[in-house]
């Protein structure tokens, strides 16, 4: 996934350089409806409420460990996006984020990292810009649970390593619809806020925690 993101970043920057050269050296009387129309990039903080289905654990011998579990709570993280405008309403780019849910027992966490190709449409209303779109790309889910040594045994399907720690890590294809709004502070700086919901298309296990996330941050562009 890192190689794909690096390739996308390279493609976007090459596009920016070519477009900048064309804009500076070529005079056109009428712009194309899909002509290069600037770019923006920045960082955003995310917070959301996520929850999983019920799941259970087992030890390395296949014996059940503990009772049923369900993840739920606030997840938080950071990330960023880079978008290039084409025409009046269309933008394409890349984004990548990390979001982590921490829970008890201490040391337990469920972390999602994802990134991919971004497409959106936007509409300007004075200093405000409303946008909607989606991201398609790759995600990875890492779930670490510290097992309470005093738990009783029951039927399950999640393997516990080293007797008291469960570690699960798996990739998936992510589709992430979103809607949001920007407010222009200056010609080059905007405050941005959006809401999304990540769909795990290929590997939605019982311990996968999903829910809406709210993002807020700053975008810089020209």
Label every PLM stretch briefly.
Residues 4-13:
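Sec-dependent N-terminal signal peptides
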Residues 20-85, 221:
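Short glycine/proline- and aromatic-enriched beta-strand/turn motifs that initiate or cap beta-hairpins
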Residues 30-32, 65-71, 105-108, 123, ...:
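Outer-membrane beta-barrel domain signature
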Residues 37-45, 90-94, 115-117, 130-134, ...:
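Transmembrane beta-strands of outer-membrane beta-barrel proteins
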Residues 37-39, 72-78, 109-115, 169-175, ...:
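Residues that define the transmembrane beta-barrel architecture of outer-membrane proteins
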Residues 48-54, 64, 97-105, 139-143, ...:
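Sequence/structural signature of outer-membrane beta-barrel proteins
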Residues 84-159, 183-185, 220-222:
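Gram-negative (and chloroplast) outer-membrane scaffold detector with strong preference
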Residues 175-222:
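Predominantly the C-terminal beta-signal and adjacent terminal strand-loop region
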